[in-house]
Amino acid sequence: MANYTAADVKRLRELTGSGMMACKNALAEAEGDFDKAVEQLRIKGAKDVGKRAERTTAEGLVVSKDGVLLELDCETDFVAKNEDFLKLAESIVTVAAAAKPADVDALKALDLDGKTVDTVIQEQSAKIGEKLVLSKIASFDGPVAVYLHKRSADLPPAVGVLVEYTGEGDAAAEAARGAAMQVAALKAKYVTRDEVPEDIVANERHIAEETARAEGKPEQALPKIIEGRVNGYFKDVVLTEQSSVQDSKKSVKAILDEAGVTIKRFVRFEVGASS
């Protein structure tokens, strides 16, 4: 017969943030001694930190506020939609929006309710029971456009794009948000072809030439074939050279030009994807 009550379990859960079974086991091992149960859970939490550090974080969310985009990762989609996890992400992005830290390490060192952001994350990790990782942050001065995409209706956004642009008015803001949606969908890497590193372009030309030769294309046709395939590569990775996902008859550049918008830079975060 258990030497503790349901009220003891409830109180222990509220005090420690641990799960129901963990609290029941702790009370059973402590033979109903509440203080000992608390101590056991604290010790177990400290030990679990090392175990959690070795686990992978393939789930999570992206969140944005006032020119900041950040990604907070966890292990399971169950935690990704957990209220405590969502509140943690919101509190962190609020701090980031106010301070505009340069990188993740700078954000982790900022104050959040009297503790560092990193400490709060570790405490929530112990409470939730999963490894939590603040993996990415970007901060733009603006004006900015944001697009957040959900993979599933019951989960928080897993893809986020932050675009910094020049332009004025509602039409400019709408066009910039359209560009953010474009990046989310087609994963552009550069704003214009001038941003593509020369060594990458040279490598694409080499691949195009070798492929054309392997296909037995006539020598006199090679220059045109190579140019066409390199241009195809640009359409894959350069935002302004892509066909718009909103209007396939127009390029992204044409839509931006009509609205008087110039994209200065953008970032795209996707939960589970490498940096």
From Swiss-Prot:
Pfam families given in the database record = EF_TS
Where does this protein reside within or beyond the cell?
Answer: Cytoplasm
Principal place of residence: cytoplasm
Instruction: Tell me which GO cellular component terms the UniProt record holds.
Output: cytoplasm
Known InterPro entries for this protein?
A: EF-Ts_dimer_sf, Transl_elong_EFTs/EF1B, Transl_elong_EFTs/EF1B_dimer, Transl_elong_Ts_CS, UBA-like_sf
Q: Where is this region: Involved in Mg(2+) ion dislocation from EF-Tu?
A: 76-79
GO terms assigned for molecular function: translation elongation factor activity
Cite the entry's keywords alphabetically: Cytoplasm, Elongation factor, Protein biosynthesis
Q: Which NCBIfam families match?
A: tsf
Give the family this protein belongs to, as stated in its UniProt record. Belongs to the EF-Ts family.
Q: What does this protein do?
A: Associates with the EF-Tu.GDP complex and induces the exchange of GDP to GTP. It remains bound to the aminoacyl-tRNA.EF-Tu.GTP complex up to the GTP hydrolysis stage on the ribosome.
HAMAP family assigned: EF_Ts
Q: What is the protein's name according to its record? A: Elongation factor Ts
The source organism is Rhodococcus jostii (strain RHA1)
Q: What is the lineage of its organism?
A: Bacteria, Bacillati, Actinomycetota, Actinomycetes, Mycobacteriales
Report which gene this protein is encoded by.
tsf
